[in-house]
Amino acid sequence: MSKVIQKKNHWTGRVHECTVKRGPQGELGVTVLGGAEHGEFPYVGAVAAAEAAGLPGGGEGPKLAEGELLLEVQGVRVSGLPRYDVLGVIDSCKEAVTFKAVRQGGRLNKDLRHFLNQRFQKGSPDHELQQTIRDNLYRHAVPCTTRSPREGEVPGVDYSFLTVKEFLDLEQSGTLLEVGTYEGNYYGTPKPPSQPVSGKVITTDALHSLQSGSKQSTPKRTKSYNDMQNAGIVHPENEEEEDVPEMNSSFTADSGDQDEHTLQEATLPPVNSSILAAPITDPSQKFPQYLPLSAEDNLGPLPENWEMAYTENGEVYFIDHNTKTTSWLDPRCLNKQQKPLEECEDDEGVHTEELDSELELPAGWEKIEDPVYGVYYVDHINRKTQYENPVLEAKRKKQLEQQQQQQQPQPPQPEEWTEDHASVVPPVAPSHPPSNPEPARETPLQGKPFFTRNPSELKGKFIHTKLRKSSRGFGFTVVGGDEPDEFLQIKSLVLDGPAALDGKMETGDVIVSVNDTCVLGHTHAQVVKIFQSIPIGASVDLELCRGYPLPFDPDDPNTSLVTSVAILDKEPIIVNGQETYDSPASHSSKTGKVSSMKDARPSSPADVASNSSHGYPNDTVSLASSIATQPELITVHIVKGPMGFGFTIADSPGGGGQRVKQIVDSPRCRGLKEGDLIVEVNKKNVQALTHNQVVDMLIECPKGSEVTLLVQRGGLPVPKKSPKSQPLERKDSQNSSQHSVSSHRSLHTASPSHGIQVLPEYLPADAPAPDQTDSSGQKKPDPFKIWAQSRSMYENRPMSPSPASGLSKGERDREINSTNFGECQIPDYQEQDIFLWRKETGFGFRILGGNEPGEPIYIGHIVPLGAADTDGRLRSGDELICVDGTPVIGKSHQLVVQLMQQAAKQGHVNLTVRRKVVFAVPKAENEVPSPASSHHSSNQPASLTEEKRTPQGSQNSLNTVSSGSGSTSGIGSGGGGGSGVVSAVLQPYDVEIRRGENEGFGFVIVSSVSRPEAGTTFGRIIEGSPADRCGKLKVGDRILAVNGCSITNKSHSDIVNLIKEAGNTVTLRIIPGDESSNATLLTNAEKIATITTTHAPSQQGTQETRTTTKPKQDSQFEFKGPQAAQEQDFYTVELERGAKGFGFSLRGGREYNMDLYVLRLAEDGPAERCGKMRIGDEILEINGETTKNMKHSRAIELIKNGGRRVRLFLRRGDGSVPEYDPSSDRNGPSTGAQGVPEVRPGPPDHRPHPALESSYPPELHKSSQHAEKRAHAKDPKGNREHSKQPNEHHTWNGTSRKQDSGACRPKDRPPDAWREAQPERTATNGSKRRSPEKRREGTRSADNTLERREKHEKRREISPERKRERSPTRRKDSSPSRRRRSLERLLDQRRSPERRRGGSPERRAKSTDRRRARSPERRRERSLDKRNRDDKVGHREREEAGLKLEAGRSPRNPPEQRRRPYKECSTDLSI
């Protein structure tokens, strides 16, 4: 199925041929206008109406139309030719001329500049047309450039070499068709001359020869053109529509198919509209580059069910029909063996001091050269971006590994880095930030930054200082020295370090000499060796020169940092507040990133730490990281402008002075960041001054004057283990500002900006903030985001929060206010379309939610090895938005099920899901963080929790409760140990809880059933319990781990078991949360699963009662001590069908708004013999299928169709089966206080709701033996119902309470006590036989009342008294005893007056004598006959009632409210 298709509206589909014959006088009747000399395609002007038009060989065809572009004339490609050449071709034709023309469109119009400004895939029709245009242009034109001639180049032949002014003048005059920059130099393609030189016109034969493709026919200057051609090859992933033209032009190198000369020339970029408007002032900026496999590479056919297609703009993309997705990447490229990064060479194979841009990039990498954000690299395979050249990065890492291996056998002595070593990594000159218009590289525009090796040539103030080396070094950081011709300058000072205490150093000072050794021209590695040789306690003399500002952004993560902390021999290195010892050599090599492209860029697009996720060997903690987490003192010089200094200040929330609240004028405040603490203003300490005093001091500075600020950056307080020691109240005063994003340093990078680290599995701390912060603190968009916005919408981006996926449909633009986190918005959601093929077992996922109006629908359990699991894109917790294009937001669960059933018939489904995007967003100081894990808190990756099976009887979503500060609360902010927002102040801490032998831990944990991304939190702390006494827990705190075991992706039951298995001591890892949100959830009885850690003393005589969850309620479990004999809460049984079925019956189902419960166990049946199942246990899965929202009939069908075996997953109940409450409607059975399930146990011998129950034999209508025996348990009327005891519900302490009193109500007892008091009625399933006396008593009762009962049955349908008795109210308020007395009174009324007055003594005596006269054998025979007769009557009544029940279930005929719904029994099925 590998084929190439094109969009119907692509211009190639509009191309047509037309043959025009000359008239009698030789006239053609077609006017040709335009031409390259006018910057236009040749196009058709006026056309004579009488001219014939047709295809060669006869036949009618489309006619030429005015305005159509001419692509070929008589087989000669004329695009890019001047008009006089086109007319020459036409004149050379004799009788007829064949034209190939196309109608103009939005992409292809007569403007040559517009078309050349676009980028297309190599080999596409658009790319070929561009090459034709350039071929034809170079017949008459010579490209121009501002660079100096190279050896062998001939001016006027290879290039026209111009000055920058001449070039800009030429561009402004409109003479150039293409303009661009490459390596800091301007290149342009001029228009051909308006008249042919010397009157010569290229003949048709010559054009045919030139366009034949032979290298011998190529003009001499095509050498330069070949460079341009190779440099202009780009991949369609960088393709963009006309609305973003500045991203569409690039001239970068493709080393895949060039000879040894090509890349050195790589010139002549296409025109860029942004350059036309304003020339680029940073010549080091480049444009995107991608290295697709060239046409010469033998990739073979596309994989099965893949096809290649073109967009209407000529962009190539690939369609995967297996998953119904599209991709820009060629799948053959992904499968091709990749060359290791460190083995990629420059095109000549020799390492010289060539630019990194001349290094070969591996397949799948793209180099982006953005006019605004500088140069960065995109790894399309691993979905990540970074500023550093990946080849250089890999080479450096390999070199570091080799050095470390060499140093392992002996004490590490750093190898001296010479220029020969440094040349292995091509040096790059420093760059300039965007605010500095001066270029970084040597160009005709501006020279390279001043450098000298002679100290006498330095201009500025010389400073001498002497520093004593402490155990932590000298206390300053150095940048620069990436190449020999670069200064080493002071970046920042470490707070309280020797340099800061000395007070002489400032940011930007150039290090001239160290101990009288001139270091001008030294590399950073050489300086490392010098500083390392100085022992601790010794002093060093430094000579500095002030007056040279840093020529690049010091906070660029690619900038090399040389710090005194890292270059000490076996000195303690402070890393994240802990002292460690490391090799000085390894640290000297880890002092930062060897510079790649330190061009102007506002922020880093990549987290340069987490190198292990790059697929490269992971370094140890980098030096820059260790320094970045320490307080730094930075000197900033700001000139006061007409509107002030360009920043605002506010009181520091933690005290200590004034902090920078907001950067208003970032170019003016270069080097200053939001959150910086102002220490000094013009050498005067202002930390003790008030806010107004500092403001007045700044106001007094005259406009135009320079102010020197000493600011402290970083050094945030580290919290103790217990959050009790930290003030949790948030400080919201007008003069109090919170930290900005940039003021919080990541533990993994020296950059204050949170860069992008994109992998399918990611840590949220490494995910990008929605917008980054540049060196001046202002919000800047992510460069990858800018790049991704230039993409077409054909590809489904992955769901991981990569910069590309951050632009997926449905994602909101989010803005982080760096001055007030009270307004900070948690990143929103992103959507994705997922196409799944159905397997034999289904689509492989389950659906939750949709039970209430407006309730979201979520993806539940992902079945292992199912279709969804194999595809890998769908996750538990994803919100379902659409099913096959049908929106399901706010729809019912049933509708989604129906849609999925329809999709199952088709064999595939297209799902649109929405997933919350979690980024690392630092919070303000003293702000209560959301209970979420972060890189501070736990080692496990934080992700959306995948609930394998949440066995709670609930489906509804747990709504996120906002704490009012813009952050989500504990319940809705993360999964069990899952993702959330990062707290910069509060960290997770461990809490150990010990309990006594006769007590529980004393806490309730809350887990969201239908919101897998919600965490597991404390819902209640029991007063006086061990949890309360420890003083470290509060409601809302979230649990991250139990006894060191992460609960990420663990279900509620797994967490329960972890705590239960802990014994008398449990250690919990906690992150503080929000108490109010959880309290609200508990009091509102939300559908959450709770666990009570109470414990019943073993001395208690009665067993503690445990109720089972009812639908849409809380489920509670107890943690009993190990000495308490009880079974696990959850268990699995596998039953084999017996002669009469599986031996159990069910109650419940979705149609009754109940979960499924075990109602009865057949005597000596398989279920009873297995020894695990008990009455009241909740059935969670049947043969692997969840019972959530399962109908009663579906459960029967699963069991019957499962063959000889059935596998059940159950949750232990308390022996009571919940009743159905018809008044609750969709709210399910009534709940008790605090959402505790209310259970009204009745005599287990009665059957509360036959309509909700089923038992299962293969013989559907045969009654089992135990059913026959149960027939005598009916009341005198044959009613097998028992009414609930209305106001009794069991607590978790095993006690019950009566809220109402009734005169005839039996004494309240727990189920065990009930069974103890009535042994003959303990077994609901009839597992215990009644005593012979009780059976004989039942026989006599049946014998005496059968006739009267049969007569009464015929009348009770019309009896008003009966109807009243059957009302729900009467049913609720009547106990079995009261019903029996009422029945006796009713029967008594039917007797004759004589009988009501009481029979005569003689009659009573005769009756007694007759009973005495009967033999035991006769009584047993009569009893057996009567039982058989009763069973037949009851069976017939149940069948009739079942039919009535089905009719009453119809939506069009709802059951009458006065009649008792679901009373009558449907056919009892024995399993």
From Swiss-Prot:
Residue ranges occupied by any WW domain in the UniProt entry: 300-333, 359-392
InterPro entries in the record: GK/Ca_channel_bsu (IPR008145), Guanylate_kin-like_dom (IPR008144), Guanylate_kinase_CS (IPR020590), P-loop_NTPase (IPR027417), PDZ (IPR001478), PDZ_sf (IPR036034), WW_dom (IPR001202), WW_dom_sf (IPR036020)
Quaternary structure note: Part of a complex composed of AMOTL2, MAGI1 and CDH5, within the complex AMOTL2 acts as a scaffold protein for the interaction of MAGI1 with CDH5. The complex is required for coupling actin fibers to cell junctions in endothelial cells. Interacts through its WW 2 domain with SYNPO and through its PDZ 5 domain with ACTN4. Interacts with cytoplasmic domain of ADGRB1. Interacts via its WW domains with DRPLA. Interacts with ESAM, LRP2 and CXADR. Interacts through its PDZ 1 domain with NET1. Interacts with ASIC3 and AMOT. Interacts with FCHSD2.
Annotated positions of the Phosphoserine modification: 357, 722, 733, 792, 1051, 1341, 1392
Key words, A-Z: ATP-binding, Cell junction, Cell membrane, Cytoplasm, Membrane, Nucleotide-binding, Nucleus, Phosphoprotein, Repeat, Tight junction
Compositional bias (Low complexity): 734-744
Compositionally biased residues, Basic and acidic residues: 1259-1319, 1334-1376, 1383-1471
Function as written in the Swiss-Prot or TrEMBL entry: Plays a role in coupling actin fibers to cell junctions in endothelial cells, via its interaction with AMOTL2 and CDH5. May regulate acid-induced ASIC3 currents by modulating its expression at the cell surface.
Region (Disordered): 233-261, 395-455, 578-615, 712-753, 764-783, 792-813, 925-977, 1092-1123, 1212-1471
Protein name: Membrane-associated guanylate kinase, WW and PDZ domain-containing protein 1
Provenance organism: Mus musculus
One BP annotation, GO: endothelial cell morphogenesis
Sequence positions that bind ATP: 103-110
SUPFAM superfamilies: P-loop containing nucleoside triphosphate hydrolases (SSF52540), PDZ domain-like (SSF50156), WW domain (SSF51045)
Domain of life assignment: Eukaryota
Tissue specificity annotation: Widely expressed, including kidney glomeruli.
Biased composition (Polar residues): 578-594, 931-943, 951-960, 1092-1110
This protein's encoding gene: Magi1
Region entry Interaction with FCHSD2, spans: 990-1074
Domain PDZ: 17-105, 464-546, 635-713, 833-915, 990-1074, 1132-1214
One of the record's GO molecular function terms: ATP binding
Residue ranges constituting the Guanylate kinase-like domain according to the UniProt record: 96-287
Ranges of biased composition (kind: Gly residues): 967-977
Cross-referenced Pfam families: Guanylate_kin (PF00625), MAGI_u1 (PF16663), MAGI_u5 (PF16666), PDZ (PF00595), WW (PF00397)
Keyword Magnesium appears in the UniProt entry: no
Pro residues composition bias: residue spans: 427-437
GO cellular component term of the entry, any: membrane
